Amino acid sequence: MKKYLFKEIPLAVPSDRAEMKSVFSKMLDDSSQSVISFINPEIFLAQEKNPLLHEYFKSTKYNFIDGINLLYAINKNLGTSYSAADRYPGTDFFDYLPDDRKVGVYLYGSKIENLENAKLRIESAHPNVKIIEWTFGYTKFDGDYLIEKINAAKPDILIVCKGCPLQEQWIWENKQKLNAKIIFGNGGAVDFWSGNTKRAPEFMIRLGLEWLFRLFASFSFKRLARQMKLLNGTRLERK
């Protein structure tokens, strides 16, 4: 797995899915906790303006690249030659887990109906994964009560889906109290896992054009303006 430092943020690029599975297997075996991320261009830009986010992504064990324009930016700045095939979207997370072991997962975030559907679909598609518990994202009990609930469930992996920067702030403040082996934020992934929000066609995913599908699936001029700023990666490439 190749590792790079881009604007003070460490980035990790596995050579293929097999290596990704190996990385997760080692993290699950590790006696220490691993906080990781799947970072896209929009989040990368956000951390440049948010000191807490910046420190968060500097401190994570691995920041896997989820976004074609972030790959293009490091290509231009670091002389690499990555393509859309080198993205590792957080939405595909369960494909990265080792097939030869049972993994317990706790989901925190999203709506109740999405969590219920996500549990059924994930466990059906990935027999080695068990969603052992979940908590919807709009609970007021996100302090010690929630920490105790998560720890009592004894998950191998905790996925926090509250959107950036809320999920990162919550993880930053609570990670030392949690006993999960792997912890990360994953935005709106539960909505996709539930089937209530459609993903792009496979050919668009392979080409790194999933952002374009999402843009038109939930179009707004504000979202369009934001994507246009990210499109050619120029803001990412600035020193």
Where do the language-model regions lie?
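A transmembrane-helix-recognition feature enriched in membrane-embedded lipid enzymes
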Residues: 71-72, 199-239
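Structural motif
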Residues: 36-38, 64, 157-161, 184
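Proline-aspartate-enriched helix->loop->beta-strand connector
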Residues: 150, 154-159, 163-164, 180
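Short glycine-rich anion-binding loops that position phosphate/pyrophosphate groups of nucleotides
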Residues: 40-44, 162-166, 189
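Conserved beta-alpha
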Residues: 70-149, 153
